[in-house]
Design a protein with these regions (language model features):
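C-terminal motif of bacterial Sec signal peptides marking the signal peptidase cleavage site
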Residues: 10-11
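Short, flexible loop/turn elements at secondary-structure junctions
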Residues: 49-52, 75-82, 137-141, 206-208
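Substrate-binding cleft of extracellular glycoside hydrolase catalytic domains
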Residues: 86, 90, 95-225
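N-terminal export leaders
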Residues: 1-2
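N-terminal module-boundary/linker segments of secreted carbohydrate-active enzymes
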Residues: 15-79, 89-105
Length: 225
């Protein structure tokens, strides 16, 4: 499956592209991946597996042990550091400062930088196998950057009110600057992947049409549609 994807991706010539990416500055690799995905639409379904940043090969290995094959889509999460007395309540999303969920789920004593750099190296290895890479980001509310109680992410009915959302999206406000500073913490790792010519299906703020995260279900001009 992985070799098939690598072969098809390699066969997408730039002068045959029919699909224009939203970002006109998208790399050639990103354009090839987009064209590949459109080329198999309605004909193939790609298997994928999410892996937690604290143990990025664990669940992929489980799939291989059960099937003898690796999913062609390999995913992970830039994640957050869970704080407080109820960190295990959020183990299902794999906070990066804890060992893999569904086990002991104990502090792993690794820094944010160490874990995210390890994620980059894992991605490079998986991409070399011909895998398609997708990354998400369970991120804290921007004022807390990368360290928060999970309830800062899973806010449910306590999602930010309109005034807070307007401050977040208004250029130059304190919260807007905190948001940009938070996003800047993952840029060095994304740049490494760009420089390694690895296209990423990048989907921060995922499930934005749900009702559980702080960024969910926001109508209006600056909505998460």
């Amino acid at each position: 499956m992985s070799l098939m994807a690598a072969s098809l991706l390699g066969g997408c010539a730039s002068d045959n592209l029919k699909i224009s990416p939203v970002n006109p500055d998208a790399s050639q690799e990103a354009r090839q991946l987009l064209e590949f995905l459109y080329s198999i639409r309605g004909r193939y379904t790609l298997a994928g597996q999410h892996n937690f940043i604290s143990d990025p090969g664990r669940y992929d290995s489980v799939v291989f042990a059960m099937t003898g094959k690796h999913p062609v889509v390999w995913g992970s999460d830039f994640s957050f550091n869970a704080q407080g007395d109820n960190v295990r309540d959020y183990h299902h999303c794999g906070p990066m400062n804890l060992t893999s969920p569904w086990g002991e789920c104990l502090p792993n004593n690794k820094s944010t930088e160490e874990l995210r750099q390890g994620l980059v190296e894992e991605i490079k290895a998986r991409h070399a196998e011909g895998r398609i890479i997708t990354l998400m980001w369970h991120c804290c509310f921007p004022a807390e950057c990368n360290d928060c109680n999970g309830s800062s992410i899973w806010t449910w009915k306590n999602r930010p009110p309109q005034l807070v959302w307007e401050e977040l999206t208004t250029e130059g406000t304190r919260l807007n600057l905190q948001w940009k500073a938070q996003m800047n913490t993952v840029i060095p790792y994304l740049r490494q992947l760009r420089d390694a010519r690895i296209p990423i299906l990048w989907r921060p703020y995922h499930e934005m049409n749900g009702v559980w995260f702080w960024w969910c279900a926001k109508p209006g001009e600056n909505r998460s549609e």
